[in-house]
Amino acid sequence: MRKRPQQQRAKMIVESILQGTQKCISEYGVLHVTTPKISEKSGVSVGSIYQYFENKEQIVAELLLRKSENLGQALKQLVMLQQQTAIQDIITLSIAFGFESLQSYHGFFIEILKNWHAYSDSEAAQVLEQHFLEVGMYLFGRYYP
């Protein structure tokens, strides 16, 4: 991000930009998102968008980072709540969680996956990888002490 929002109003503007971007990705596809479209969907002027982000790629990267962090945390929470569950059932549950996540956010994650080659080295990919590693280590330690 170009400028980190400090005040509540600025944080709300950034959140509106990110929500507008998510809507654009779901509606137009990530390759057809433009800053004017983000402006229209978010209700934030193009000039204000550029106060916080250098370009649309940076907006998408920030959105994907936040969504990836939330997704990873949700998976960890889901797995850790399964105290008396067989590992096979946790695997099935985790796969179902993954497919449900793909369908959530009006196709946002499906659109990102279609273009994963552009994001596979992103900070968001590293965040997901770290969460998956932590889940795997937790399960390994629990079932194979």
Listing of model-derived features with the role each one plays in the protein:
Residues L63-I90:
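Amphipathic alpha-helical linker/stalk segments
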Residues M80, S104-I110:
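Charged, amphipathic alpha-helical coiled-coil/dimerization segments
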Residues M1-M12:
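N-terminal intrinsically disordered/low-complexity leader segments
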Residues I17-I25, K67, L71, G98:
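Short hydrophobic clusters on alpha-helical segments that form packing/core surfaces
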Residues M12, S16, C24-Q58, E62:
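Helix-turn-helix
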Residues E69, Q73, D89-A96, E100-S104, ...:
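Amphipathic alpha-helical packing segments from all-alpha helical-bundle domains
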